[in-house]
Structure formats: C-alpha cells, structure tokens
Amino acid sequence: LGLSLASSKNIYCIDGDGAFLMHMGACAVNGCTGGDNFKYIVLNNGCHESVGGQKTVGFRIHMEAILESCGFAICRAETEAQLRQGIKRLAKQKAALVVYIRPGSRADLGRPTSTPEENKHCFMEAIQA
C-alpha cells in the first residue's frame, strides 16, 4: 500500500489464497485507500501449498465478492487466455485478479537460498530504481 501511494508506478501484490484469507483486514484497507496503481493478484489453489499443502476454504468462498466489496474491480482467470486478458485489464485500473489453479508443485521445486536480510536489500534496491 505504501509503495502505491508513494509512486506513480503500478505496484503488484501477489498472494496465495491462504495469505488472502489470513490478511483480509489488510485487503480491505488496500482496496479502500490504495491508488489506482495498486494491483492485487490472488493465486487460488485451495491450499497452503508452500507449507505442506493443508487445505484452505479458497474454493468455498466468494473471493471475488469480498474483493469487490473492498473497492477492487474484479478479474477472474481459469484459463491461460483469461489470465492474459486479466493481466492486461489490471494494468488499466485498480483491480484484483483471482487466478484459479490446481494444487501441486514440481518434485524438484527448490527453496529460497537468500536470507531475509538479503531479500530486504534486494527489494530496497529495486524500489530505488
């Protein structure tokens, strides 16, 4: 949110459905006070894939209705064509794109190798550019 208010660049926030569900209060604040350059993408696979795959209620709630009530225009994608269209639409307005995907990841999917502090410095350098 802070980046979108301090910059004219498009700012993209990408969350999984688990993070969306845990942080709905922030979603309401972002939707109501964020600028038109704030873009929110939710990857909904119905589970916390990165921490063991436990199920969420992501497929059982009306995520788009929640996001719309928070002030976002809504895009929904279940196909590659819808995803491409949704990304184009995001660039033009304050919107949320909910991408419905199947759970599962590659067996050889690596884990992060950088430390949180290295990530912080990389992020700080990127926003200065």
How would you label these PLM feature ranges?
Residues 1-124:
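Thiamine diphosphate
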Residues 128-129:
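Charge-patterned, long linear interaction tracts outside catalytic cores
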